[in-house]
Amino acid sequence: MQGPAVFIDAEIDDQAQELRKFFKSLGAEISEEKSSKGIEDDLHKIIGVCDVCFKDGTQHTLEEIDAVLNSVVSIIVSIPLERGENLILAFCEKMTRAPDSNLARVCLQSLWRLFSNLEPTSPLRYHVYYHLVQVAKRADQVKEVFSGVDQLKSQFSQCPPSNEQMQKLYRLLHDVLKDTNSELASKVMIELLGTYTAENASYAREDAMKCIVTALADPNTFLLDPLLSLKPVRFLEGELIHDLLSVFVSEKLPSYLQFYKNHKEFVNSQGLNHEQNIKKMRLLSFMQLAESNPEMTFQQLQDELQIGENEVEPFIIEVLKTKLVRARMDQKARKVHISSTMHRTFGRPQWQQLRDLLHAWKANLTLVQENMKSVSEAQIELAHKQ
């Protein structure tokens, strides 16, 4: 998201007085006269009433409101940062009061201008960005201010927020993303859990549970094994949520169905959809079967995945769409031929398998190199004889 540079062709004092008059005309309790205490007091009073332009009945367009807020921002950025912190925080809080999405978009632009005009080394950028995310949610523009964790970190590279501040921001991002982008919300929660250390991981119980639930609910997250290594998740061992995660990490469909039968109320209380869970477990079970079965019959899939005869082909097509498995379907022979599959877990056996594969490639390449060398030498020798 890009905001225009802040520049108003008027003296700061004159701007402040015009803003006072404008807000007073809208019914705000503010004097039209400039403060004898200086521009900072003027700005304090202006920010205190600037949300009056959000009220119903104002005869001003969104463009006019945007211009007024831009004028406020232009004064804010002219104040030295060491004296402007409270003013910036107060303005940010006012921008979160936009009553509808259209006004929220105007406020989002104003906050983005403010954020863009702060020095990259300013710690206030964090506070402005936090409010940016809040307003972006109301404006349905979250993707404009957050595209991923790497982008987020780069924005604060010259003045990294504290660990506690990042935890607060990650929680907010998860909250605004969970209903519209579950995959990104899951990544944010995993990043959040990564901020905890062995010393404070026990305090991350709620975050860890949210992370697990978000990952399980995300239809595009299938590699769940890394969650088990996160310290806050380890502290949940022995609890139902950890048991459920373990089922999704390494068990097959029957194990999930048994878990649901025994703990139906718990699963539902976490906001998880049973039918979606079954769909995901079928995909995960297929992946696990594909690891050790280069060829599977349709009947085998019916039995293992508990699906009807007419559901097998549509299911295989859905699996192939995920690109988790590369396979070829032989409809005539009613078989599936597996080329490759993503492993559900990647532990020591998988590393050993990868090591063996790389060694085999190395040996084959060495053999090819030696054969090519022999052919080359033979050709040279033949050329000399001729």
From Swiss-Prot:
Alphabetized SMART domains for the sequence: PINT
Query: What's the superkingdom here?
Result: Eukaryota
Disulphide-bonded residues: none
What is the protein named? Eukaryotic translation initiation factor 3 subunit M
For this record, the Gene Ontology CC terms, alphabetical, are:
eukaryotic 43S preinitiation complex; eukaryotic 48S preinitiation complex; eukaryotic translation initiation factor 3 complex, eIF3m
Q: Which InterPro entries match?
A: ARM-type_fold, COPS7/eIF3m, eIF3m, eIF3m_C_helix, PCI_dom
Q: Which organism is it from?
A: Aedes aegypti
Q: Which UniProt keywords apply?
A: Cytoplasm, Initiation factor, Protein biosynthesis
MF terms from GO for this chain are: translation initiation factor activity
Subunit-structure text: Component of the eukaryotic translation initiation factor 3 (eIF-3) complex.
* Family to which the UniProt record says this protein belongs: Belongs to the eIF-3 subunit M family.
Q: One of this protein's GO BP terms?
A: formation of cytoplasmic translation initiation complex
Which residues does the UniProt record annotate as the domain PCI?
181-343
Q: Where in the cell is it found?
A: Cytoplasm
Tell me yes or no: is Disulfide bond among this UniProt entry's keywords: no
Q: What does this protein do?
A: Component of the eukaryotic translation initiation factor 3 (eIF-3) complex, which is involved in protein synthesis of a specialized repertoire of mRNAs and, together with other initiation factors, stimulates binding of mRNA and methionyl-tRNAi to the 40S ribosome. The eIF-3 complex specifically targets and initiates translation of a subset of mRNAs involved in cell proliferation.
